[in-house]
């Protein structure tokens, strides 16, 4: 039998490249799972850390209501909000194409249940004026 003088690393590199390809493909599918919302631009935005305890309420451009990235009717959302603690943190993510009326409906639901700790998601407006 012939003795190996050194270890052949080419098969190891092949396996690593296949694993890298799998990770990259999987990561792209995970990022596509989020609801696409074109949030409005604002010049006075503040960077905030994502709060894991905050509830996420989203309105898409086709006026669909989402609670933590799951489609929900306005009636079910109203029931859900009524069950929250008054100090509950809420993040609103509203598409810029949505009629202002829908935004008011959502904030009215929160106000009716005395939810005051609300953050609105916007993009930083970088256009020079």
UniProtKB/Swiss-Prot annotation:
It is a single-pass type II membrane protein. Keywords: Cell inner membrane, Cell membrane, Membrane, Protein transport, Transmembrane, Transmembrane helix, Transport. InterPro entries: ExbD, TonB_ExbD_2. The chain crosses the membrane at residues 10-30. It holds the Pfam family ExbD. GO terms for biological process: protein transport. Residues 1-9 are cytoplasmic. Involved in the TonB-dependent energy-dependent transport of various receptor-bound substrates. This is Biopolymer transport protein ExbD. The lineage of its organism: Bacteria, Pseudomonadati, Pseudomonadota, Gammaproteobacteria, Pasteurellales.
């Amino acid at each position: 039998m012939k003795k190996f003088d050194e270890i052949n690393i080419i098969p190891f590199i092949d396996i690593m490249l296949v694993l890298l390809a799998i990770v990259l493909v999987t990561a792209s599918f995970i990022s596509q799972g989020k609801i696409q919302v074109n949030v409005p631009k604002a010049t006075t935005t503040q960077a905030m850390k994502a709060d894991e305890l905050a509830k996420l309420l989203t309105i898409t451009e086709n006026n669909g209501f989402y609670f933590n990235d799951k489609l929900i009717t306005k009636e079910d959302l109203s029931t859900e909000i009524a069950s929250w603690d008054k100090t509950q943190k809420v993040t609103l993510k509203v598409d810029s194409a949505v009629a202002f009326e829908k935004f008011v409906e959502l904030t009215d639901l929160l106000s009716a249940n005395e939810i005051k700790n609300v953050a609105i998601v916007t993009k930083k407006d970088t256009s020079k004026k």
